[in-house]
Amino acid sequence: MKKIVFVLVLMLSSFGTFGQETASRQFGDAFSTPIAAEVNKKACDTELPPSDWCCEVCCNPACAGC
């Protein structure tokens, strides 16, 4: 009987952990895109980006190959 209770508790705790991981991954994906888009918009709206600015983020015309 103790083994059955132990197995049930273990299964429930594993399910809870898996559910939290899946939920946090979904929320992370949902929030990352708008934040990245907002950062790109603000960065690209600046007139003079810093010299070490990454071309992949803003496609800075000063960088070759954008």
From Swiss-Prot:
Molecular functions (GO terms): toxin activity
Signal peptide: 1-19
Subcellular locations according to the entry: Secreted
Disulphide bond pairs: C54-C59, C55-C63, C58-C66
Any one cellular-component term (Gene Ontology): extracellular space
Propiece residues: 20-50
Keywords: Disulfide bond, Enterotoxin, Secreted, Signal, Toxin, Virulence
Pfam families according to UniProt: Enterotoxin_ST
Main location group: secreted
Family: Belongs to the heat-stable enterotoxin family.
Its biological purpose: Toxin which activates the particulate form of guanylate cyclase and increases cyclic GMP levels within the host intestinal epithelial cells.
Descriptive protein name: Heat-stable enterotoxin
Species of the source: Yersinia kristensenii
